[in-house]
Amino acid sequence: MLIARNLSCSRGRRQILSGIDLTLPAGEMVGVLGANGAGKSTLLGTLAGELPGDDAAVSLCNRPLTDWPVDELARSRAVLPQSPGLGFDLGVTEVVAMGGYPFPEMGKHTLDTLLDRALALADVAHLATRSYQSLSGGEQQRVQFARALVQVLACRTADSYRALLLDEPISSLDPRHQLQLLGTARNLCHTDALAVLVVLHDVNLAARWCDRLVLLADGRTVASGTPADVLTPPNLATVYGIPATVMESPVHRGVPMVVFG
């Protein structure tokens, strides 16, 4: 399990995260919410081992994250950054196949099967013969999601812990693909026992798809728990600085729906 205990992080004299506690168990999807500059991406990057935080504040499978070699870490977690750049052009299938790089022992047939599954799950199979640079921003985002899926699904031993860390993965997607991506991530929590952490701005999508939410403000946890426990008018006003009305979704029973303003 990925665990943060009293995690703090600073850049120069600026404190970005302070005293964050978070657990990410297998089979659960956790959403991170907050206004711009709240520390959401820094939290995800620190949990991924890509940004420095307090030594030993983060552990993966009962081992400090700082003790994990990069190649071993890549076999246990996959990261979809907010702006996944690619400085050179490759075919879509080549980009998705990058997710298999941490697994050199994987045979071609196994990789091809995994590629087909990831391309279908991300709804980019029809783009497989295209060049990456020819795609729209939303299409590129889905291709990168497929790459992360290959990486996180490649390790399939019975006792393996696998975390999928997604930083604003729907920022360039149309409504259909937003629902599809989040639904895919949620389904994989259940079918493949993945642990998923996702940074989002849409509180209603977070409420619908996430098992738990973490609400941040100024690098601190304002609330953590179920969507119903976290998405309250006082919490939302504290974080976003505007009034909020919370009601039950008329479409999804038991799911809170937030209206701002």
Swiss-Prot record:
This is Hemin import ATP-binding protein HmuV. GO terms for molecular function: ATP binding; ATP hydrolysis activity. One of its GO terms (cellular component) is plasma membrane. ATP binds at G34, A35, N36, G37, A38, G39, K40, S41. Transmembrane segments: none annotated. The gene is hmuV. NCBIfam families: PRK13548.1. Keywords: ATP-binding, Cell inner membrane, Cell membrane, Membrane, Nucleotide-binding, Plasmid, Translocase, Transport. Residues 2-243 form the ABC transporter domain. It comes from Cupriavidus metallidurans (strain ATCC 43123 / DSM 2839 / NBRC 102507 / CH34) (Ralstonia metallidurans).
